[in-house]
């Protein structure tokens, strides 16, 4: 018995064209049936997260500008400046963390524990950023509406 026959016997009938073989079904979405490149997937995911982080960073910078323009007379000036500053610092930290996550090779089993820790850390920091931004939204950054009509 040759090794090729044993493989077919152990795994079922996987000869090209047989039912259930990768060659029997047409590829979905025009792609070939091949294993997922984990590094490529992780890099795309990190790039998407980085873009969202940049968008939130820009929004927080705009909010900080609006709060500073309102000045000290705004009721929630200090809490908003502190919360927005915390959010900005955490976002920069997550951005740097994502750069390190993209840098490492996921196929190296020796680095799996470190990558898992960094990924969990990034997820935790993103959760904290979301909570901080919920409070920023609750305090509000909009300018108060001024009465146009004179009071009598």
UniProtKB/Swiss-Prot annotation:
Region (N-terminal adhesion motif): 26-37
Site (Cleavage): 56-57
Record flagged with keyword Repeat: no
Top-level lineage group: Eukaryota
Signal peptide location: none
Region of interest (Helix alpha1), ranges: 44-55
Acetylation among keywords: yes
Name this polypeptide is given: Ninjurin-1
Record organism: Rattus norvegicus
